[in-house]
Amino acid sequence: MSLVDISYVSDSVIEWKPYKKGDDIVKRFSTEDWHKIACDVDSEEILQELFENHPDKIQGYVLYEVKNNTPIAFVYILKEYCRIKTVSYHGGGWGKSPRLTLLYMRGTILLIERLLKEGFKVRTYCNKDNHNAYRFMQGLGFVRYRTTEERIYQWINLRRLYNSNIYNYIFKRRLL
């Protein structure tokens, strides 16, 4: 049984596909960047094993640009044990161009929107020193709800997503 079906999260620009063996995600990131996404996973084999052994708790997805079917980002959704329909969202893109960043933002918005519309509470967290992740999620409308010595925890709802700077920049200006 899968955690959530996102097979229909796509538009004419991007498409999310379930992570599968052979996607070779880990090597697309620098070691430093990868450990910001999944600090305890050091190889593709460990990542595959994690998804295979816990399909009801964690799922991975790869974001593709529709035009040329090129992978541009990876995320995983982790079911939080304390709540039935609460998930934690983590990931990143490996493209460094402004266009690839906009595509990743667009894909992230569509995926988070789908999760929220399916009735999931969506949260995330990042290490305090991961300023890029914190600013990105804040730009999407995430709000801090807890801080520890090491991490910042955030949540989002549909209203905050639709009112966010990034959502308005991409969808109201019809970029891409």
What do the PLM-derived regions correspond to, one by one?
Residues 71-73, 141, 146:
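A structural microfeature
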Residues 88-103:
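A short, internal acetyl-CoA/4′-phosphopantetheine-binding micro-motif in the GNAT/acyltransferase core
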Residues 2-45:
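Short amphipathic alpha-helix that is part of the acyltransferase structural core
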Residues 125, 143-157:
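Conserved catalytic-core motifs of GNAT/GCN5-like acyltransferases
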Residues 99-115, 135, 139:
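Conserved acetyl-CoA-binding loop-helix of GNAT-fold acetyltransferases
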Residues 49-64, 73:
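A short helix-loop-beta-strand connector motif used in the catalytic cores of GNAT acetyltransferases and
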Residues 62, 69-88:
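Conserved beta-strand in the GNAT
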